[in-house]
A protein has these predicted regions:
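Bacterial N-terminal signal peptides
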Residues: 6-15
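Positively charged n-region of N-terminal signal peptides that target proteins for export
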Residues: 1-4
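Gram-negative and organellar
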Residues: 22-306
Length: 306
């Protein structure tokens, strides 16, 4: 963990020397912000989503507070998020998740930008565990030679700590994991809020606990089209292949899950309101019969930004 923050501090210093802040002092702008969002999730799937896993119905509340300090070419941002999940139904537990983020965006020239980010998650759900704490560092380069085309490449390193949960069994114990993630993204802008986007990702986690090890490759495409000034629709599809190195399928081989999830989103953003709805079908093909399933996930959320 200390190594990640030391690396980020070193890079921040190289990208933005103290003299830059002095030269731009007259143009710095400070902007605090916040967001409150209430949502409802209904799902028939054990599919894992970052921060939320629901097999049934749940009400969610998201609270976000942050502050941004920006000049013409540099932006610092600090942000804190908390999410409450109240799973409906007798005997179903509720929980909360926290996330803290520090970000620096720096324009290098008219075409290039770099992002440096440090992030801390407390008690969130990952592919390999139900109760994970994570500290991560990220470097992202953006190349936008013209407004119609944007390319991004990012690399991050994650350090994870796992607390055992009842689903892990009576012999489970606290363990750690670590590993890289690489993302490549392309977005083609066709007009205002009118985009085609494609994303590729490769990631892995290594751990002394074989049950926590996995590798994953994924790809996604989406198309965003405005229907009027405030309303747009976004169909898309995502495919994910995950191999769990310390788990065995019914065929005696390493457990391998392939998931494909077509979805459609509606986004209505009148003024400072953010009203969003998503319908997703989830199909998982696995050599572990317990994980071989199909399901759906429906989400609607109303948020206000200020």
């Amino acid at each position: 963990m200390k190594g990640i923050f030391a690396l980020c501090s070193l890079i921040f210093g190289l990208v933005l020397p103290p003299s830059a802040a002095a030269q731009d002092d007259a143009r710095w702008r400070f902007d605090p912000y916040g967001r409150v969002e209430l949502g409802f999730v209904s799902a028939e799937s054990g599919d894992r989503e970052e921060q939320i896993v629901v097999d049934g119905d749940a009400v969610t509340l998201r609270l976000q507070a942050g502050a941004e300090l920006a000049s013409d070419t540099t932006t610092f941002q600090l942000e804190a998020d908390r999410i409450y999940v109240d799973r409906l139904g007798e005997g179903r537990s509720s929980y909360q998740r926290d996330r803290f983020t520090a970000t620096l965006d720096q324009e290098l020239d008219s075409d290039w930008e770099i992002r440096l980010q440090a992030r801390r998650y407390d008690d969130f759900i990952t592919a390999e565990a139900n109760d994970t704490d994570e500290t991560s560092g990220l470097v992202r380069f953006t190349y936008e030679p013209e407004r119609a085309h944007r390319f991004r490449l990012s690399a991050s390193w994650r350090e994870r700590e796992y607390d055992p949960s009842p689903e892990d069994g009576p012999d489970a114990f606290a363990t750690t994991g670590r590993g890289p993630r690489v993302d490549a993204e392309y977005r083609h802008r066709l007009g205002r809020y009118h985009y085609f986007a494609a994303d590729l990702r490769a990631e892995s986690i290594a751990s002394d606990d074989a049950f926590r090890r996995y590798s994953r490759q994924s790809g996604a495409v989406s198309y965003t089209r405005p229907l009027n000034h405030d309303l747009r629709v976004r169909p898309g599809v995502e495919a994910i292949h995950t191999r769990f190195g310390g788990r065995t399928g019914d065929d005696g081989e390493v457990r391998s899950d392939f998931r494909i999830a077509p979805e459609v989103e509606l986004l209505w953003w009148p003024g400072q309101w953010r009203i969003e709805a998503e319908a997703k079908a989830i199909f998982i093909d696995s050599n572990d019969e317990r994980r071989d399933r199909a399901g759906y996930r429906l989400t609607i959320a109303a948020g206000y930004v200020f």
